[in-house]
């Protein structure tokens, strides 16, 4: 028997764009934008979709793929509880939810990367990132170099 996701018909939502979230995360408190997505659930179901691919949703600095905290929903969208309530509503309507999460790179504000910026070679996280080299600087002004996702130095690659 095939797993559910091989039989599912997915609908994709990029919530930061659809919900008009600010392009840069300067928010100090969480906005409750997930409630605005509730109106899409009947539409998704009426199209015959059985699953929602949503994301990115984790706390980030900009476009969402520059993750700075994998434990928190981006405050421009709401809180973890707001997201849980949205997912519960999807499930009540027979729609499964898959989250677009990035695990091969982070944003520059990710705590491990910030630790390298601060402690340099003394950082216990220096091996978490690919190509860390204290012999040259990055194009972003860091005192060390590192591999970046497709040359985008705001997205340092994890050493997986």
Language-model-detected regions and their locations in the chain:
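N-terminal structural segment of carbohydrate-active enzymes
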Residues: 1-99, 104-160
């Amino acid at each position: 028997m095939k797993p559910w996701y091989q039989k599912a018909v997915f609908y994709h939502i990029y919530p930061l764009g659809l919900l008009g979230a600010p392009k840069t995360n300067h928010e100090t408190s969480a906005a409750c934008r997930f409630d605005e997505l509730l109106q899409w659930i009947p539409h998704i179901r009426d199209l015959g979709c059985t699953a929602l691919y949503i994301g990115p949703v984790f706390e980030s600095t900009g476009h969402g793929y520059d993750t700075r905290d994998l434990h928190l929903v981006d405050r421009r969208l709401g809180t973890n509880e707001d997201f849980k309530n949205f997912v519960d509503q999807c499930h009540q309507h027979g729609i499964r939810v898959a989250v677009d999460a990035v695990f091969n790179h982070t944003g520059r504000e990710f705590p491990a990367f910030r630790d390298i910026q601060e402690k340099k070679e003394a950082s216990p996280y220096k091996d978490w990132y690919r190509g860390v080299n204290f012999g040259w600087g990055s194009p972003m002004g860091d005192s060390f170099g590192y591999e970046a996702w497709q040359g985008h130095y705001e997205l340092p690659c994890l050493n997986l």
